[in-house]
Amino acid sequence: MAKFQPKVQTEGQDDGMREKMIAVNRVTKVVKGGRILGFAALTVVGDGDGRVGMGKGKSKEVPAAVQKAMEECRRNLVKVSLKNGSIHHSVKGHHGAASVELHPAPKGTGIIAGGPMRAVFEVVGITDIVAKSHGSSNPYNMVRATFDALVNSTTPAEVAAKRGKSVEDIFA
């Protein structure tokens, strides 16, 4: 059976949060009496200032699945440290067979990333970044790998605190 997956990412803004729908999958459960159709939606929500969340919702209808996914996004917000519209340093993230590499970029570069990663960067507030994905191109795995990378990035202050030095000593 063919996959139902719109390539268009929808965007909405509610209560200051940016919402993006990444994928909608049509799923089928085969039972004795025939097939039962359902839908699964993957969405991300962010405030454009470093907070981002992802969610997956399932239902018999698309709007209900998207609504459930958006609610889960708002429950699972995480804070990401940003530096002038980019990240502090290069970082890698993994989930399942998907792995991503994120590299900071100078102002004016834009978001150089494909598919689901681009949606995450847009809602979190990153304007300049270079990203590369390896392995699985499954949207769910790519979003989780991107979250893994963003959450594992550290600020210079955190590195200095771990080493017991000042921030100036880290850059010297």
UniProtKB/Swiss-Prot annotation:
GO terms for cellular component: small ribosomal subunit. Gene3D superfamilies: 3.30.160.20, 3.30.230.10. The keyword Thylakoid does not apply. GO terms for molecular function: rRNA binding; structural constituent of ribosome. Keywords: Ribonucleoprotein, Ribosomal protein, RNA-binding, rRNA-binding. It comes from the Bacteria. Pfam families: Ribosomal_S5 (PF00333), Ribosomal_S5_C (PF03719). Residues 17-80 form the S5 DRBM domain. One of its GO terms (biological process) is translation. The N-terminal domain interacts with the head of the 30S subunit; the C-terminal domain interacts with the body and contacts protein S4. The interaction surface between S4 and S5 is involved in control of translational fidelity. With S4 and S12 plays an important role in translational accuracy. Located at the back of the 30S subunit body where it stabilizes the conformation of the head with respect to the body. Part of the 30S ribosomal subunit. Contacts proteins S4 and S8. Belongs to the universal ribosomal protein uS5 family. This is Small ribosomal subunit protein uS5. It comes from Paracidovorax citrulli (strain AAC00-1).
